[in-house]
């Protein structure tokens, strides 16, 4: 019973950290990264479809993305979706390929992005702490139901705390790396 609670807590904490990594992958850091386009969807045959499912996205140069749609008729729609997105990119098209030149980030924009990065890290820390609280509540319930002894529950709560500390430290590390990447000129 206690092991189930600990395993579930760890699985949920891992998912919280993975979600943060995915979120950070979509944040623009002055370098071309195909993941920047993950959140952009295009109305395609009546369905909102992610750009990465409509085209081949490649990085020919460190500051350029090329988007080559498999269906050429989707090219103008992809272009429009990129313009509407909050990425601040201007697509240029030659009729078969869309080129996205990634401009150098201004100091002001870097600061804004770092604030976003910190907020997302804080949201992840809160999620991990909420998982800790839920796990501790489940452990107390086991003790109350006499399914586990007080000592076992105390030990398990210590394990949950160690786990929480480990994942919060991991979130801090990921945030620091992303922050450094953004502030790099």
Curated annotation (Swiss-Prot):
Annotated SUPFAM superfamilies: Ribosome recycling factor, RRF (SSF55194)
Keyword Mitochondrion attached = no
The record's GO molecular-function terms, alphabetically, read: ribosomal large subunit binding
Superkingdom of origin = Bacteria
Q: Where in the cell is it found?
A: Cytoplasm
Q: Which cellular component terms (GO) are annotated to the entry?
A: cytoplasm
Q: Does the keyword Protein biosynthesis apply?
A: yes
A single Gene Ontology biological process assigned to it is:
translational termination
Q: What does this protein do?
A: Responsible for the release of ribosomes from messenger RNA at the termination of protein biosynthesis. May increase the efficiency of translation by recycling ribosomes from one round of translation to another.
Q: Which family does it belong to?
A: Belongs to the RRF family.
Name of this protein: Ribosome-recycling factor
Which organism was this protein described from?
Desulfitobacterium hafniense (strain Y51)
Q: Lineage of this protein's species? A: Bacteria, Bacillati, Bacillota, Clostridia, Eubacteriales
């Amino acid at each position: 019973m206690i092991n189930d609670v600990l395993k579930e807590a760890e699985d949920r904490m891992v998912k919280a950290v993975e979600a943060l990594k995915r979120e950070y992958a979509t944040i623009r850091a002055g370098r071309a990264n195909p993941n920047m386009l993950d959140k952009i969807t295009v109305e395609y045959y009546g369905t909102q479809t992610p750009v990465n499912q409509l085209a081949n996205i490649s990085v020919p140069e460190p500051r350029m993305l090329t988007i080559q749609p498999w269906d050429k008729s989707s090219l103008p729609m992809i272009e429009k979706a990129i313009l509407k997105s909050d990425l601040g990119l201007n697509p240029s098209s030659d009729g078969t390929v869309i080129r996205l030149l990634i401009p150098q980030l201004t100091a002001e924009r870097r600061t804004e992005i770092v604030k976003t990065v910190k907020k997302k890290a804080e949201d992840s820390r809160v999620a991990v702490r909420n998982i800790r609280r839920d796990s501790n509540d489940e452990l107390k319930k086991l003790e109350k139901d006499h399914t586990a002894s007080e000592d076992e529950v105390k030990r398990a709560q210590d394990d949950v705390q160690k786990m929480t500390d480990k994942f919060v430290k991991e979130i801090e590390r990921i945030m620091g790396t992303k922050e450094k990447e953004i502030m790099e000129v």
